[in-house]
């Protein structure tokens, strides 16, 4: 779901527009106090100044993506029903918590999310798949947050310390530390790019220097490398791994959305909002 405040302001503007039906006068009052008056024009201007660019970005993004990447209504409804079943009687409360007006508003968000997933799928080329055509490997790692600590661990390993024991003592990866850092077998496109690049460069038994990723600093040990399977046998699983990796990467989604909006040749007629697509970035998915 996208930024909660956008939905709240969308609802406010909808309410304002409804209440203003039949009132053409911009000096009509929205609220008054003993010595204060808030006019309709002033209220609308404040909303536009504060939230107009965010709203325009979101509305245009949804329109461009959902029209280019069609998602069947049955698929959207299926996802909506899945969430409704998950939350049961709390579903309406969940909508309120996210600032969504009603189920239809939620459905539009699901449709946008699924359309973005479709855009991500279409972004994967045959070259991307072939670039990730590599043998399945098995690795262990020790993850820490500080680079100097990672360097110290590497020095201990170079001096003969047990990788498995150091992983149990020092690694911050709770899922693998009790297994001596063992990550099991994985294919290309499964791990963080920086991690994978380093792991695939190692020979079996070799230990890497500290590798930085968004999770911290890794010291990686390659423990096995399988024989490379025929391309036709693994290409579908490689593509699926790439889809999952890109879908889970907010940076990739943001970049892809910006590229799609650029290709849409958007023209803004309102001078107050003219720089929306150069200054405003998406709030997230």
Curated annotation (Swiss-Prot):
Cystine connections: none
Keywords: Cell membrane, Isomerase, Lipoprotein, Membrane, Palmitate, Rotamase, Signal
Keyword Cell membrane tagged: yes
Major location category of this protein: membrane
Signal peptide: 1-20
Catalytic reactions on record: [protein]-peptidylproline (omega=180) = [protein]-peptidylproline (omega=0)
Class of enzymatic activity (EC top level): isomerase
Topology with respect to the bilayer: Lipid-anchor
Family annotation (Pfam families): Rotamase (PF00639)
CC per GO annotation: plasma membrane
Lipid tethering residues (S-diacylglycerol cysteine): 21
Domain PpiC: 134-224
Subcellular location: Cell membrane
Purpose: Plays a major role in protein secretion by helping the post-translocational extracellular folding of several secreted proteins.
HAMAP family: Foldase_PrsA
Name of the protein: Foldase protein PrsA 2
Organism of provenance: Bacillus cereus (strain ATCC 14579 / DSM 31 / CCUG 7414 / JCM 2152 / NBRC 15305 / NCIMB 9373 / NCTC 2599 / NRRL B-3711)
Gene, per the UniProt record: prsA2
